[in-house]
Each structure stands twice: as structure tokens, then as C-alpha cells.
């Protein structure tokens, strides 16, 4: 089967985990990994797996006679904002795993196929990938005037990039709750849990709903979205059934549905407790595969 050629820009933990997922893909063939640290473990692992590697950054990749069909970038927002127009000029499609948000945001269960023609798509945040689908599941059944998510992740799984971008995380995720999740107003909170041994990612999703909402339909919609996510993140699961509460002072006089989920990683490179990172690489792979299928069908 013909596969779309892929370059991974970035050689850190996320890029390395992504590499293992891409290698299993029926549609994507990782051939290059680009970094800036010649001693990085990611580049060393990529070389052992037969990829062409360079520590000379994006300039090296764009100067190669053969260009990739897709690039997955897991560097920083600043680096990707600089590189994105260069990828587009070279005819390379980009899947952005940084907070740069140059292109439209994609959450597979909600809007996977809406932006397959875009030159650049953004994967929002780990918290967004884990929680926005649940908001979407509720909002496609009833109006959601307000939604709030709390993402709790192991502190050791949050690298310097995550810590430096907490404000961007909350703003980007909150915006995604509204624009993709379908809530009229959204709020996001992230908690870095220092527990040892590290805890698996856990998320709480609150949605305000009409008092007379069809609770069975909402529950069914949530279960269907969870099943969709489990196709590419097997460790994604509900901790219990969605909980419905009647209007109260605590909820601002609105009825609510609360959903609790946890995300256990596949353990490809990152440890299983780092489900917050695993769901990003898994979702990016899913999006890349859909883009590749469209590219290859056009070429055929």
C-alpha cells in the first residue's frame, strides 16, 4: 500500500512517542525526524529505526530535494509560527501539536473531517482532546449554556513547555470548548498533581443543561463519543456513568451533567500514566491518517 511520507519536527518525548504510533500506521510512513540537539534520545531512536535525522532544524528539511507529504510538529508555539508559512509555501501539510493554533483546531470525534483540506491543523491541548468530545456529545443533544473542564495530570508528565504555557492551555482549551464543543461559554482548569507514584490523567467535565433535558439521550451520546475515542486511545474510559443534578444554588440555578474520565497511555515511549501526552499523539496520528487518505485518493 502506498503511504504518505512524514517528517517529525521536534525530537522530545512527544515526538518520540508519536514516532512509534506513526510506524504502526497503514497510511503514514515516518521518514525524517528533525531536531536541534544532536545528542537527543529522540534522534538516536529514530536513526535506529531507519529514519533520516538532522539536528539542523527546519532549514535542513526544507532544503532536501525530496519533501514530505506531511509534517508533524511538536516543538513550541514560537517555532511553529515561524515555520508554518514555509511548510505551506513548500506544499507540505502540517499537523501542529503546539499551542500556536496557526490553523483550525481539530478534535477527531467532533470535527475530524471538516478541515482535511486545510494546509495546517492544530491539535489544541491534551486537556482539550480529552474533554471537548464530551462537551460535544452533550451539546449535540441539548443546548449547553456553560461548560467547565478540570484536567488533572501527573506533575512529572508536564514538561517545561507545558508549564510555560499554562495560560495558553486554559485560553486555547476554553475557546475549543465553545467553538468545537458547542458550549455557549467555556472554562478550563489544569491541575498538576505531584502524587508519587504518578497518577493517570483524570478529567471532570461539567455541562449546564436544560432542566427538562432527555437524560437517556445525553448518556447515550456520551457513550458513543467515548467509543469513538477508544478506537485510537484504548485507555480512554468513563470512571462511572454521567451524573445528573437538578438546578441548585451551587450550579447557578441550572441543571447539570457531570462526566468523569481517565486516560491511560499506550506506553509506546511515554509511561502509561502520561495519558495527557498519549492522547495528543494518538489524536494527531488519527488526523494525519485522514489527511493522508484524502491526499492519496486524489493522487490515485
Curated annotation (Swiss-Prot):
Reaction catalyzed: acetaldehyde + NAD(+) + CoA = acetyl-CoA + NADH + H(+)
Gene Ontology biological process: catabolic process
GO molecular function: acetaldehyde dehydrogenase (acetylating) activity; NAD binding
Catalytic activity, EC: 1.2.1.10
Superkingdom classification of source: Bacteria
Organism placement in taxonomy: Bacteria, Bacillati, Actinomycetota, Actinomycetes, Mycobacteriales
Keyword NAD attached: yes
Organism from which the protein derives: Rhodococcus jostii (strain RHA1)
Residues bound to NAD(+): 11-14, 157-165, 276
Residues making up the signal peptide according to the UniProt record: none
Pfam families referenced in this protein's UniProt entry, alphabetically: AcetDehyd-dimer (PF09290)
Keyword Oxidoreductase: yes
Keywords: Aromatic hydrocarbons catabolism, NAD, Oxidoreductase
Top-tier EC class: oxidoreductase
Family as reported in the entry's similarity comment: Belongs to the acetaldehyde dehydrogenase family.
Coiled coil stretches, renumbered: none
Active site feature: 126
Disulfide bonds: none
SMART domains recorded: Semialdhyde_dh
Protein name, as recorded: Acetaldehyde dehydrogenase 3
Residues passing through the membrane, by range: none
